[in-house]
Amino acid sequence: MQWEVVIGLETHAQLSTASKIFSGASTAFGAAPNTQAAPVDLALPGVLPVLNKGAVERAITFGLAIGAKIASKSIFARKNYFYPDLPKGYQISQYEIPVVQGGTLTIQVEGRNGQPGYEKTVNLTRAHLEEDAGKSLHEDFAGMTGIDLNRAGTPLLEIVTEPDMRSAAEAVAYARALHALVMWLGICDGNMQEGSFRCDANVSVRRGPDAPFGTRCEIKNLNSFRFLEEAINYEVRRQIELIEDGGTVVQETRLYDPDRKETRSMRSKEDAHDYRYFPDPDLLPLMIGADWVDAVRATLPELPAAMAARFESAYGLPRYDASILTATKATAAYFEAVVAAAGAANAKAAANWIMGEVASNLNRAGLEIDAAPVSPVQLAGLLARIADGTISNNTAKKDVFPAMWAGEHGGDADAIIAEKGLKQMSDSGELEKIIDEVLAANAKSVEEFRAGKDKAFNALVGQAMKATRGKANPSQVNELLKKKLGAA
């Protein structure tokens, strides 16, 4: 029987405001426990929440970027539940009328197991503002749990999709695209290790695309793309095996154990009525006029999809290259700076180098591209020397770029080429003389080539490059050899 997987994601993106959503306390990460909790965060008597304008503007920014409707009037609600790290006994969230409604996000799903990749549009249900809870600390307290309220009141944007994804690969592609977008917009730092971006996955299975949805289980607080994929794949197998063995899937909340690579039951899954939502009487309705939306729209950066399309049309880049270069804002900025210095004619070469040598060296060094030792202008200088034939692409990769990366001669390609004596031979008369000598010394290879053995030609090219100590232009060597051998 062909089972279909149904997945929806709820993502909590911590908004990059300096202060909390309803108080003036700092949102900085890593402070000593309970040193960044204002009276509002502590739920002290008589204090009232004041909405952070910056959090609202970041929500509007996100809504505009995904083509959503921005609600002219939205309501904050109290989500009632008890937990030790929730001092008020309720969380301020949005329920019936969220600030962002609808929207879409187009994702690129990687091909796997010989299947091609594809593009898919995921529909979003909503994105709403809410406050984060505190944090329970279980380490260093013998038989007890500590409570840190520094995180309480931190502004979150909860982003909810429709159940549109049909595999773990699609869910990961969506999560990666969303992660890249919120960082591109500057509304979230995307630091998954610090909990700034975490996903809950709602997973169910059904007997084919026309069958009713199955009972879903929610897997909470997945803070890496690898964990997200592993958790979904395990949960899908668990549900299918359970049903095929005659059991029934129970609606519940589950946690993922990355060590055992399995999900386990945490609690029965609550429905909305369990939280007894009602409008927060301490907060007025949030009114967002067209002028405010237009003001935020004016600050929007060029979005990744639009920039990728521009790279394709302006520079003739393949779609794959354009999508890789616009995966992060820093990579796109680096590419554009290289092209600005090297010229549009070198755009494809710039893309190849950034996706190749630059990316591999960054990965080995554990660096982001904005910390690359080779600047865009320096890389453009190297590309210019390849383009004008001063050095070959191979010499650039093998000898010049590593020296630039190491900071030799201040990363100046020309100085490194001169110091190492890497300039290609430009005297065609001298090269022709060397090729004559190579042909005379390799009569057997000449005979084999004339007998139709193409490998013999490659051997002659190798001998010519060896004789010039790699300084000859390979294309010029090929051209002269063919001319001498009568194969041109």
UniProtKB/Swiss-Prot annotation:
PROSITE patterns: GATB. One of its GO terms (molecular function) is glutaminyl-tRNA synthase (glutamine-hydrolyzing) activity. It catalyses: L-glutamyl-tRNA(Gln) + L-glutamine + ATP + H2O = L-glutaminyl-tRNA(Gln) + L-glutamate + ADP + phosphate + H(+); L-aspartyl-tRNA(Asn) + L-glutamine + ATP + H2O = L-asparaginyl-tRNA(Asn) + L-glutamate + ADP + phosphate + 2 H(+). SUPFAM superfamilies: GatB/YqeY motif (SSF89095), Glutamine synthetase/guanido kinase (SSF55931). InterPro entries: Asn/Gln-tRNA_amidoTrfase_suB/E, Asn/Gln-tRNA_Trfase_suB/E_cat, Asn/Gln_amidotransferase, Asn/Gln_tRNA_amidoTrase-B-like, GatB, GatB_C_1, GatB_Yqey_C_2, Gln-tRNA_amidoTrfase_suB_CS. Pfam families: GatB_N, GatB_Yqey. GO terms for biological process: glutaminyl-tRNAGln biosynthesis via transamidation; translation. Its EC number is 6.3.5.-. It comes from the Bacteria. Keywords: ATP-binding, Ligase, Nucleotide-binding, Protein biosynthesis. It is an enzyme of class 6 (ligase). Belongs to the GatB/GatE family. GatB subfamily. Allows the formation of correctly charged Asn-tRNA(Asn) or Gln-tRNA(Gln) through the transamidation of misacylated Asp-tRNA(Asn) or Glu-tRNA(Gln) in organisms which lack either or both of asparaginyl-tRNA or glutaminyl-tRNA synthetases. The reaction takes place in the presence of glutamine and ATP through an activated phospho-Asp-tRNA(Asn) or phospho-Glu-tRNA(Gln). HAMAP family: GatB. Heterotrimer of A, B and C subunits. This is Aspartyl/glutamyl-tRNA(Asn/Gln) amidotransferase subunit B. It comes from Ralstonia nicotianae (strain ATCC BAA-1114 / GMI1000) (Ralstonia solanacearum). The lineage of its organism: Bacteria, Pseudomonadati, Pseudomonadota, Betaproteobacteria, Burkholderiales.
